[in-house]
């Protein structure tokens, strides 16, 4: 089967292209610009086009050999030239998870789904790492680059597939998981779910589609229906004391994974010690409190709960060296800011200095006014520590001064801040 991936270098589409390649399909595609993923795809012998994405390469590829599937991300506009051309050519068009669901079904794999508002990527990477360290063949897809393998991989000897099941655009409802690990349920993606009830009901449906589920009880009161095979852990008593990862949120997510894998028999008394050793040696995933330089970190977090969790983890590290914490924060999506503005309050208390950037705009509702930094920060308790800034050379000079004075600097956001920090460092 020949599959064309539009946006082949993205963190959602790129790993799936790798999986399709390893599963024996012919893979090609396009993207606007190169990335770490496109470099990895090139090394694997996959051909694709970098440039305009105006439909010309797609048409030429289809003339060379007919394309069976045109796969795209839910973020692709319906009037995108490639999507329009694919429909003009009469190609089967599908979003990412429709194809992945087919591959999982065709290969008769048991899906281990990592879902939830926060921590999906790190937890998916951790679960994959555990399988690898236990020498259990595994197929997987991770929404980030990792240091211990490709972002997406199909192993013909595996019985299981580990996947980051994203709730955006209701993508996770394409699947019927063998095991679902739900890290958290905090209202997000207002462009998909107009109300909190819509969001909760989607997770309710997801649980109903899962054979086994593990989650924290305090995250589930509004969506738990009392289905069988749902393991609800207690926050106060059930955090695994053998897990020593930095960051309480990481320890909680790892506890869920170990509990879930134990529930379905993958972890048992014979390999428990090795599994815990794997957890505690986990190297992390890119853009998840990833160190770029000594004392300079980049993190994907862009929700108040994620901000607080990451700064708590930064505090654990900074306290050992008596360091100040400097945060560079880029809010993500104006439509999201309209929904979470009221929640910005005490999440920033661990930062002695906060450089607040303009909101990164993506998939916006044109009817909404753009919230200013002043409007977004009016309820923050320590707003006297906030400095409004732009991603420019002046900011980088200030960050270098902070680093030279021994501060721990964290850049947070899902937009352009990560790329900017990498270029500067």
Where are these regions (language model features)?
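A glycine-rich beta-strand to alpha-helix segment
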Residues: 67, 393-425
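C-terminal helical cap/extension that packs against the catalytic core
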Residues: 44, 345-405
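Conserved N-terminal Rossmann-fold NAD(P)-binding element of oxidoreductases
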Residues: 3-8, 412
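Nucleotide phosphate-binding/pyrophosphate-handling subdomain across enzymes
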Residues: 2, 12, 19, 108, ...
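Conserved beta-strand positions in the Rossmann-like core of class I SAM-dependent methyltransferases
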Residues: 28-29, 139, 355
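NAD(P)-binding Rossmann-fold cofactor-contacting core
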Residues: 25-40
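P-loop/Walker A phosphate-binding loop and immediately adjacent motor/lid segment at beta-alpha junctions
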Residues: 91, 209-211, 228, 311-321, ...
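Phosphate-binding loop of NTP-binding sites
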Residues: 19-25, 42, 55-65, 74, ...
